[in-house]
């Protein structure tokens, strides 16, 4: 079957590579325009564009899919089916009508849960234990089309969004190929999405990724993992922005005075106010609304990430120092 592949980030590469190795013919790749990247903000092609160029495929980078010249270019490809993996823009109705078998999208959730731009991040943020991937037929509305197939993936307690997305990209690629095979053979028909269990996963902005230390420890942990690596969880210290990597929960929490001299008994943790930092010999604790969390990595503005203990030694924190 003649395929048009639409995708942009690294996440789409396992699907593109698997389709290129299959019996199907990828006739062209559709991706987002070159975007500024790096410190110099120099425009760079997307990971999918680079992979397509290396494979000798034609690459289309339109700013608007609805432009007449873009629609004409899509028609000229004579693609029988278009497949989408994290393309990064809605496909308008005139484009949806071009391939004979329509457009199939690989979405990283079990639809109808977490429709939208950030399904993996929201699954972690809300404490889901299982997620997955879904192939479905694109419609004009957001992630509402009938479903071809699904695959499930457990969410591990220490998963970041990056970890989980990497696994889903691989398992989803196989699901996508199976879907394309089924459509090509005429043996796979989509079924309507369930009307119950609909939830939405809007894009998470840098503002959303700011840590609220007045939240419970479990929420701080989930937020940090949900926005790692992008956009990155952050806080401030003395007005300066600091990015934090995943944390561990410190259990249990006790008030001081557990021993006769007021010191802490082995394994006990002094109560900390939300955001308050306590530096110990082999760990750095921060208070939340419940139990403290143990910091993993710390990245001050303009510097590389480092272990929290190394950061604390160099920061020379005053007693009672607190993240805002």
From Swiss-Prot:
(6S)-5,6,7,8-tetrahydrofolate binds at residues 109-112. It catalyses: L-methionyl-tRNA(fMet) + (6R)-10-formyltetrahydrofolate = N-formyl-L-methionyl-tRNA(fMet) + (6S)-5,6,7,8-tetrahydrofolate + H(+). It comes from the Bacteria. Coiled coil: none annotated. Attaches a formyl group to the free amino group of methionyl-tRNA(fMet). The formyl group appears to play a dual role in the initiator identity of N-formylmethionyl-tRNA by promoting its recognition by IF2 and preventing the misappropriation of this tRNA by the elongation apparatus. PANTHER family: METHIONYL-TRNA FORMYLTRANSFERASE, METHIONYL-TRNA FORMYLTRANSFERASE, MITOCHONDRIAL. This is Methionyl-tRNA formyltransferase. It comes from Acidothermus cellulolyticus (strain ATCC 43068 / DSM 8971 / 11B). The lineage of its organism: Bacteria, Bacillati, Actinomycetota, Actinomycetes, Acidothermales.
